[in-house]
Amino acid sequence: YPVSPGHLLIVPKRHVATWFEANEEEQREIWQAIEKGKEAICQLYQPDGFNIGINVGEAAGQTVPHLHLHIIPRYQGDVPDPRGGVRY
């Protein structure tokens, strides 16, 4: 960790385990934080794209039992196949 330069975590103050336990106001504030985080990352790192992710439940890869969201800046050629991560 971090996955790439500029990798950012958004973590709400109130403890909730997953996105689905957050109330509407918290979810709205998280989306606003995504926009602010994206702007800051773009100014500092100039990425070519982004992965934005929330893991919900152990089967989905959640290892920390507190809601958090990853904003991962991606750069051309940083991984062989950027489409591979969440496919079934």
Where are these regions (language model features)?
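HIT superfamily nucleotide-processing domains
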Residues: 1-88
